[in-house]
């Protein structure tokens, strides 16, 4: 079983509706109950910011600062991490000229937020993701890249560098005259980054597909069949250099078409994640709302198991309103599955009774009026 990573202390200052809040925790799961709007998801969002990126809501950092707070927000966590006990502090100081996120690890400024992945991996499932299979492809790409990032921390940097290069190419193409040699240099960079992104996605999907096949009988949730579409389909058995040459050629040949369109029409930014309900052999978007939710839960739990298997450390799970639409039997099975992953999970709900099957495996807190109390 993977080693357990768990948060032992959490302190928030001027974060969302919390002027100040502190939690002292043990290694068990954490259940947060309270009325809608009390701030349960806000606390989960704070934990999600212990990973690279903008957290589970993808909010601008300035937007998570408590109204009327004088100097931004801060989050402090102490955890038993992948490299022993560690203290992490992160936040934004709005008195600075920049609102860039600051990060300290054991009191030392970090060079990049990617250093967070040396200490823990954080995965989440929220009600906002319920429309993942029926919404636009951009949301599925973002979801896909979060899955990849938890296994390959460099993926986020490659993706942002690719986007930057693509914007430069689009800008050059918008000019009536452009320098072909300069454009070729940008396209070579895009080809290198774009193929690296695509291969990382394909590798993660292959690993996840194999794990799902191996564990189908051990879960009450439906199995997802996964496929990528929209970029170099069926060609990823070729060497990476051949793929880079092929993509660079596509970009070169598509210059005038892309100039007319005002955007780059080929690349990893056009990829879509296709999901099928394996047992019913049905596209996920055609499944019922309940089936889609069950598919998504099963997919997240399978990915959490994969992260634990490959890193040797179980991820911290954030499961917002996870029990709301499950019957008692499936809730109990879900809690058992979460327990077997070997990590610490944070779960929210309005009714503590929904989590009764956890028993002593969890610590319970009530959230109300910008405060958190043990219950």
UniProtKB/Swiss-Prot annotation:
Gene3D superfamilies named among the record's database cross-references: P-loop containing nucleotide triphosphate hydrolases (3.40.50.300), RecF/RecN/SMC, N-terminal domain (1.20.1050.90)
UniProt cross-references to InterPro entries, sorted A to Z: AAA+_ATPase, DNA-binding_RecF, DNA-binding_RecF_CS, P-loop_NTPase, RecF/RecN/SMC_N, RecF_2
GO BP annotation list: DNA replication; DNA synthesis involved in DNA repair; double-strand break repair; SOS response
Compartment annotation: Cytoplasm
SUPFAM superfamilies reported in the protein's UniProt record: P-loop containing nucleoside triphosphate hydrolases
Binding site for ATP: 34-41
Single GO cellular component term: cytoplasm
Keywords recorded for this protein, A-Z: ATP-binding, Cytoplasm, DNA damage, DNA repair, DNA replication, DNA-binding, Nucleotide-binding, SOS response
GO molecular function, one term: single-stranded DNA binding
Pfam families listed in its UniProt record: SMC_N (PF02463)
Function according to Swiss-Prot or TrEMBL: The RecF protein is involved in DNA metabolism; it is required for DNA replication and normal SOS inducibility. RecF binds preferentially to single-stranded, linear DNA. It also seems to bind ATP.
Entry similarity comment: Belongs to the RecF family.
Listed name of the protein: DNA replication and repair protein RecF
The organism of origin for this protein: Rhizobium rhizogenes (strain K84 / ATCC BAA-868)
